[in-house]
Amino acid sequence: MTRARLQKPEEYARSAMKAIAANVQTIADEIDYVEVNSLINDLESAHQNKKRVFVMGAGRSGLVARGFAMRLMHLGLNVYVVGETVTPAVETDDLLIVISGSGETKSINEMGALAKAKGTRLASVTSNKDSTLGTISDTAVIVKGRTKVSGMDFMERQVIGSHISFAPLGTMFEISTMVFLDGVIAALMEITKKSEDDLKKKHATLE
């Protein structure tokens, strides 16, 4: 049986956009800016002291991490994406930034714990402050979005092809995190007195 549509397709799209925008506004109003300042200070310190920054995430959170890494590179930071073949090993005083909605992806948490054991500072963006990731992080910025945690982590769901209907909640977290991290970039631009023209000079010429 075909389910009757309550809205036209374009109305679904409009409603989704409004819901996402409202979620971003709520997060901007409610986010813990003590943790935000801690993350910004970590990045400012890495920039001033020429320390390395590593970013990491799985799935769509990984794509958000890559976009953030690109902007950090534009600002002149020494940044790497975990998982790339050219990414070096983490060392003492490096900064690792992890993005995970659930905060319970096993592979992500294992790498985070390994980095901490090497003396790396760990910062995270997650929607679950009581998660494993949130607990082990030196700085944990909570971005509300995904509130339910599956018994399987991200990698396990991909292997068996299980796509539980967390997509809307996941989307809320990922988009809100992307907007939040762009806000962090704006703050770093102000701190470092970098303009958009300065960032353009660092933009890739081989694409």
Where are these regions (language model features)?
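Glycine-rich phosphate/diphosphate-binding loops and the adjacent beta-loop-alpha structural elements
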Residues: 45-58, 206
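Short, glycine-rich nucleotide/cofactor-binding loops
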Residues: 25-32, 98-104
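Conserved active-site and cofactor/substrate-binding residues in soluble primary-metabolism enzymes
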Residues: 11, 15, 19, 34, ...
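Generic N-terminal amphipathic, Lys/Arg-enriched alpha-helix
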Residues: 1-30
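A short, charged, Gly/Pro-tolerant segment at domain boundaries
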Residues: 11, 183, 189-207
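Glycine-rich phosphate-binding loops that contact phosphosugars or nucleotide phosphates
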Residues: 52-58, 62-176
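A short, well-structured juxtamembrane/interface segment
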Residues: 31-47
